[in-house]
Regions:
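Long, leucine/valine-rich, helix-dominated scaffolding and oligomerization segments
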Residues: 2-4, 42-43, 48-220
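Amphipathic alpha-helical packing elements
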Residues: 2-45
Length: 220
């Protein structure tokens, strides 16, 4: 990669980074702000069962570009995985859910965070379909006072995700070395099972746990 090409690529990534977190936090940049209770409004690919309930949602996105030249092509898929954070106060040897916990000068509230995900897929001569997965998980962070006494904890939960990247390459009748590249990203995450860790219910905040959020592509 030449210096000019590398510079262009880094500039594109910087722009994509800004887009990736658009709507993650809205001014005045506080989790308890009313405006921050309605977030993640663009590039959201819901699982198929959600789209069946609400046709205004989408489970796939399609991109088509004209490629000039014979070089190799890679597709980088980027999105956010929702991470639901709950707050628990310690009482004796047990922890109980609360809406807010103050520890020293910090206030901790229930909030939807996000984990950045990125996958790079090479494009074959004719294209291909690749099915990828993102693991779920549960992490615990203890909150202590200056003396080291545990006052509470944060519990962060993520749902597993499954999605497919389908590429297709066509070579139109042309005197030039051009190709038509189409890329489709499908959210194939199944409905939540009995052991699902995140919230349930027929509402968008619950659905977002199984969505690809701020989904977009970088082509090189």
């Amino acid at each position: 990669m030449t210096g000019a090409t590398a510079s262009t690529w880094e500039a594109a990534r910087a722009l994509a980074d800004a887009v990736l977190y658009e709507g993650y936090l809205l001014y005045p940049y506080r989790p308890d702000s009313v405006k921050n209770q309605v977030r993640f409004q663009w590039g959201v690919l819901m699982p198929p069962d959600v789209v069946a309930q609400d046709p205004s949602e989408s489970s796939a996105q399609h991109t088509e570009v004209l490629v000039d030249g014979r070089g190799d092509i890679t597709v980088t898929v980027r999105f956010l995985q929702l991470q639901h954070r709950t707050v628990e106060r310690r009482t004796g040897q047990r922890f109980h859910p609360v809406d807010r916990l103050d520890v020293c000068d910090a206030a901790y509230t229930v909030f939807d965070e996000a984990v950045q995900c990125e996958f790079t897929v090479p494009v074959g001569d004719e294209g291909d379909e690749v099915v990828l997965a993102v693991e779920g998980g549960r992490d615990v962070e203890h909150l202590s006072d200056p003396d080291g006494d545990v006052l509470g904890r944060l519990v962060r939960v993520r749902e597993p995700l499954s999605f497919a990247v389908t590429t297709r390459v066509e070579r139109p009748d042309s005197p030039y070395a051009v190709r038509v590249l189409s890329v489709r990203v499908d959210n194939r995450t199944p409905p939540p099972g009995p052991d699902s860790r995140t919230r349930r219910g027929p509402a968008r905040p619950a659905w977002l746990g199984r969505a690809l959020i701020a989904d977009h592509l970088l082509l090189r």
